[in-house]
Amino acid sequence: YDLNGSEAYVFSTYGFGSGVTDFNWRNPLTTSAFGESAIDPDYDLSETFPAGFSPRFGQDDNDFALTGGYRSNNDGRFSYDLSAGYGRNQIEYFMYNSINASLGSASPTSFDIGTLTQSELTFNADFAYRATLDFLAEDMTFAFGAEQRTEEYEIGAGEYASFAIGPLAPEGFPSGSNGFPGFSPEQSGSSDQTSYAAYVDVEAPITDRWTVGAAVRFEDFSEFGNDTNGKLSTRYEVSPNLALRATASTGFRAPTPGQLFSERTSQGLDTTTLNIFTRGRYSPQGPIADVISLRDGVDILPLEPEESENLTAGLAW
């Protein structure tokens, strides 16, 4: 929408999809879920799946994004773009053609496994100025800006039958939905991270054929502190149809809240001790990691940001 030389804008996207895959076939002659139970004499999985079964694992996903802002028309030397954006992606997992054998005859054959949700909210302010300098072939472009970004990751628990340790567990019947146990309430929850960034980018045409550039970006993360990265670039036109270019830069990528705090575990019952055990992947930032690190010779380190150094060169034809 035009506003006297500037414009307001908004755009949005929405996408959805679904998919299903299967796990290996469960042989009724060798799978423990097909055993007989003294606790629940009515349980007979061979009546439900006489030829065995292949658990089916699926997902429904929804993705939504909305961006709006206010920007100049770029006709003058100074231009700007102020914007805000929100995005959300959610995956709902489900299983069917499966069983929680530890629940016996009370077990359903389809399960809601739980949900994973990632959302991001960003605010951006970008500015550019074209300066005329006598010693340059053309105007120098000076760009700068700032960004605030908040990420949130959420795990939603599945239905009780998808992760339950049922009454038949002491007899050796496996717990949780066969193939992929659901997310338990202990695994559910949300975590977030906020970052603030500022950047400066300069590009100068030294001659009609030779252009150089330099950029620096500073970013501060709520979970990691701050980091500074830079880039140097050059481009030389050998002819109207051929150019040489080269770039040297550093990079930084912080782990997301999902990578930092999410856990994926399942529980079972030791038929000898009748103790419940938990196995799976724990967060290196969580309390379990702190306890395990107290053991001799064990030191679980928290996730660190990825850092990189890059050199590129090439031809443009």
Question: What do the PLM-derived regions correspond to, one by one?
Answer:
Residues 88-92, 97, 146, 150-155, ...:
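Surface-exposed extracellular loop regions of Gram-negative outer-membrane beta-barrel proteins
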Residues 5-8, 77-80, 135-140, 209-212, ...:
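Repeated loop/turn-to-beta-strand initiation elements of outer-membrane beta-barrel proteins
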Residues 1, 66-72, 125-129, 198-204, ...:
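Residues on the lipid-exposed face of transmembrane beta-strands in outer-membrane beta-barrel proteins
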Residues 1-23, 27-51, 55-75:
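Transmembrane beta-barrel wall of Gram-negative outer-membrane proteins
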Residues 24-43, 96-106, 158-168, 230-233, ...:
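Flexible, surface-exposed loop regions and adjacent strand-edge segments
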Residues 192, 196, 219-229, 307-309:
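Solvent-exposed loop/turn segments connecting transmembrane beta-strands
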Residues 10-16, 82-88, 142-150, 198, ...:
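Transmembrane beta-barrel strands of outer-membrane/channel proteins
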Residues 45-47, 53-67, 73-75, 86, ...:
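Outer-membrane beta-barrel transmembrane domain signature of Gram-negative proteins
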